[in-house]
Amino acid sequence: VEQIMPKRAKELMQNENWILVDVRPQIDWCRKHAYPSKNCQYFIPLEVRDLRTFTKQAASLAIFPERVFSSSGYANVEENENFIEEVVEEGLWGEKVILYDDVGGVIGEEMMDFQDGVQTPSLMAIHELVARGFGAENIKHMAAGLEWWDEVEDFEIGSAEQMPMGM
């Protein structure tokens, strides 16, 4: 899987019909996303449904207390069991896709002092897609994610109303 910068992502979208896919929770995508992008959530907000998820949420907040005051509207996330289904429903299976999240992660860039890379949701989503048979040749990873998307000239940021969960 090739890692590319946002400027190259835009070129591939415009000239070679690659599709930009945001893997952040839908609530984040609705607030701000690279335009145009589709949303397939790799993680979803963690809902307190029972004692197990309550314990998980409490432990997470003890480790990451800054999330209590986060503007995201949720304190923690859990893996989306329907991630692959969302990819299929969006008509993306087998298409040429560029995945991103908020910060992008790094794939083993020695010059950036990350010998083994930095794991982020977009990289985890890529791993999941490849493991499930989505051809690696049809996937690119956008380094720096949304954080650098609006730093490049002529890039657009979009927002949308949040869709009800389950749609």
Tell what function each PLM region has.
Residues 22:
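N-terminal glycine-rich beta->alpha transition that marks the start or flank
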Residues 1-18, 26-167:
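Rhodanese-like catalytic fold shared by cysteine-dependent sulfurtransferases
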